[in-house]
């Protein structure tokens, strides 16, 4: 049955003319029948997968628009060059990202009666908090809240906060949002030569940004809370972000994942 293991771990259902991209027991049953004429019940398929060491997991999604050449260029040349620049100038490297945390984003599970889906009542209102944060390989974390949408001027304000708090040159790595390399940012860098460098990750590659883990961590915590107003939510968000900020080892762990290990301190 090695071919089943290879099919599931190395491919996806679309390679077998299915419309779906996730392996479910139903899809695997159909694939077995379609490809090899093997008919098994769902329970039998489940036992077979367990024997093969396979378990149901929440997948990581990566864009098919990723350019592998650009990814290699960043990992093999761009980032090593930025790291060398940091070593030479004493600069501190930060990875930056923005996110919106919403009241209707719920995560986690709860115990309940078998066969009945538990109901958790909330206000039904929708409100959110917008944030920007930055993390460094040595465990530093900075964050800020803002109203409205992020733009070049707001991004520059955050860069200035990073520069002042660092007390030395900074290298900031962000995604390819237009305001990350627009005129306000270019003007700000020109006004602080040698003090602020802004670089960009390859397009469609959020997994390379360790700061993504700030949001994963924060949303996992906040998704379990009862937030009845925007005031309550802001207080909870600030408390959660401060908790992450004060946990240096947690922030360092964001750089120890498979896709972020390249940026860890050597």
What do the predicted segments below correspond to?
Residues 1-266:
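Short functional hotspots at interaction and active-site rims
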